[in-house]
Regions:
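Extracytoplasmic/lumenal domain signature
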Residues: 1-180
Length: 180
């Protein structure tokens, strides 16, 4: 879970034994990543993916986490100084598997929880949807294609939708998108 307005970190606990929970990890682990994260509002979406590791494909349980809330990004005409980044984290170790940043038009923070979707019903997440503070909806393709053998090195993100610019206020996205 995230610290929300109290900080920029996420942490994981093993609560298999509810009488004796165990600390697992904290993210981020490096100052360079921490400098780019906003307040950790985003409740992670959890799912399985296939990734390439040492030339082999392995199954991983992951957390999908938005880059966080940047209070400066709420003002019309401004862009985020932090939080305009999206992560895929190994849920057992807290290690970052993938960082989506620097994409065209990815200039606003991601405080909302993402929605992970298994589009082909194979038990693995294929798409992750999340909104940003500019009213943009993003989709991150984290699928594995058995035919072309695409894996995490080919994962990509793109803007799916943008709220109309002619409106007086920005359309900040604070809530998890519903996907049907």
């Amino acid at each position: 879970c995230g610290l929300r307005k109290g900080g920029k970190h996420y942490f994981a606990l093993d609560i298999t034994d509810t009488l004796s929970p165990k600390y697992l990890w904290e993210f981020p682990k490096t100052p360079g990543v921490l400098d780019r994260i906003g307040q950790s509002w985003s409740e992670p979406a959890i799912g399985r993916v296939k990734i390439e590791q040492g030339g082999d494909l392995v199954e991983k349980w992951v957390a999908f986490i938005g880059g966080g809330y940047d209070p400066y990004d709420e003002k019309k005409g401004t862009e985020a100084t932090t939080g305009n980044i999206f992560f895929v984290i190994d849920i057992l170790t807290g290690e970052m598997i993938k960082e989506f940043s620097g994409l065209v038009l990815m200039r606003h923070s991601f405080p909302a929880p993402p929605t992970a979707v298994d589009t082909n019903q194979d038990g693995y997440v294929d798409k992750v949807y999340v909104g940003d503070l500019a009213g943009q909806m993003w989709v991150f393709d984290v699928s594995f294609d058995e035919i072309s053998k695409t894996s995490d090195s080919q994962w990509k993100g793109q803007r799916l939708f943008m709220a109309p610019k002619d409106l007086l206020e920005k359309h900040n996205c604070y809530y998890q998108p519903a996907v049907a």
